[in-house]
Each structure stands twice: as structure tokens, then as C-alpha cells.
């Protein structure tokens, strides 16, 4: 695969969040979308890229707790850690159809999972 499938994107945005187009990028082979809420000061990113041969995921084991979860039918890894100011930060990673997907943010676990289920 040389580029993301046509129309591949994230299709669910929680209430109160706006996309920050200045901090993001979109290319044929990958994208990064950045969202934030002015009200709650929460934010998250959605990063999707085609899987490159030999690509490895690096995980921070020292400060993050990992568990196996499902995103649809795909096996996923959900990491939980704390930011410098004590907020809970989640990082969810999974692969589907030759695409590596990562969502990271200080939003609720339920919202992270709902966003993930609407990436296609």
C-alpha cells in the first residue's frame, strides 16, 4: 500500500472539541489531526499512517500502564499515564487494513474508544 485508503479519516468528534488545522498535516500516506476543547482544556490527536515494512512501535514502559483492548475486530493496546499536571493521558494504538492508528489525549477512556471506532 502506498497511500491511505480514499476517505480514510476520523469521523467522530466529541462535543465541544474543535479541529486545530494549524498544528496538523495531511499527506497521501499519513495524517495528524489535532483537536482541543477551550472549555475543558482537554485535547487529543489522531495519527494514521500506512504501515511501512520493518516499522516498530516504541512504548514507554516506565510511566505507562498497558492493557489489551479491541477496536471493532482489531486488537489494540491502550496505555494509561499521567501528564505533568496530573491529568490522565491515554494512548490507543491499533492496526487495521495496513494502516497504523494512534489516538492520544487527556480525554475520557470512553471518548477515546468512541473516536477509535469511527476511524475508517
Where do the protein language model's features map onto the residues?
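Short, solvent-exposed recognition patches
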Residues: 1-96
Amino acid at each position: 500500500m502506498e497511500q491511505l485508503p480514499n476517505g480514510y479519516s476520523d469521523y467522530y468528534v466529541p462535543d465541544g472539541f474543535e479541529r486545530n488545522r494549524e498544528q496538523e498535516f495531511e499527506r497521501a500516506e499519513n495524517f495528524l489531526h489535532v483537536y482541543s476543547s477551550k472549555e475543558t482544556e482537554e485535547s487529543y490527536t489522531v495519527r494514521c499512517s500506512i504501515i511501512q515494512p520493518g516499522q516498530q512501535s516504541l512504548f514507554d514502559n516506565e510511566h505507562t500502564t498497558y492493557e489489551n483492548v479491541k477496536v471493532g475486530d482489531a486488537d489494540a493496546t491502550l496505555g494509561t499515564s499521567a501528564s505533568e499536571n496530573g491529568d490522565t493521558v491515554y494512548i490507543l494504538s491499533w492496526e487495521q487494513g495496513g494502516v497504523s492508528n494512534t489516538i492520544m489525549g487527556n480525554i475520557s477512556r470512553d471518548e477515546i474508544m468512541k473516536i477509535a471506532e469511527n476511524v475508517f
